[in-house]
Amino acid sequence: GCFMKAVILAAGKGRRIGSEKEGTPKAMRIVNGRPMIEYVVKELSFVEEIILVVGYKKEQIYEHLGDKYSYAVQEEQLGTGHAVKCASEFFADYDGPVLITFGDMPLLTTKTYKKVFKAYNDSIKKNNPAACVMLSVNLKDESLPYGRVIRDRKRSFVEIVEEPDCNEEQKKIKEV
């Protein structure tokens, strides 16, 4: 595999898509006959180690995926940054790239993930290492319920603000 680690954020309840009512973690929602998380781990099978950050109803994810992956627990859902921090023990003695993705993104492919990794490697080759390479999209419809990418005047990444927390100005941003 590729000398790289991947963190899959899969602790969420999925309130907006009704998973919580079903008693299922968001990443275990069925898409085309399989849980979303299954597609994500399959597409990331090229990496050295996959760490899943689990929380709500975590046993369902453990039971489905088994012990071929590493697990970190996010007891309280305190946001994306906190979820990544919950996996930090797996990087204590690691100095390589870490790909962070979401357990509810079943349509991202190996090809896309490898392009992100290549962009990071290219930045190193140019002697200008990127602290972060981010995959985002610009949506035509800003009314969709996604976190918005906030950038500064130089277009550098600042933060992601989840849709329910966005002010009116942030809701106009089309980059998610």
Place the predicted regions along the sequence by residue.
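Conserved N-terminal catalytic core of the sugar/cofactor nucleotidyltransferase
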Residues: 1-5, 16, 30, 34-118, ...
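Histidine-centered beta-alpha loop that forms part of the nucleotide-sugar donor binding/catalytic region
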Residues: 11, 55, 103, 137-138
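Short N-terminal binding/cap micro-motifs at the start of the first secondary-structure element
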Residues: 14-18, 143
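Short, flexible helix/strand-to-coil boundary loops that buttress conserved ligand/catalytic motifs
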Residues: 21, 65, 161
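Short alpha-helical oligomerization interface
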Residues: 22-27
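Conserved beta-strand scaffold positions in the cores of enzyme catalytic domains, especially
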Residues: 28, 71, 132-134
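Conserved core of the sugar-phosphate nucleotidyltransferase
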Residues: 108-176
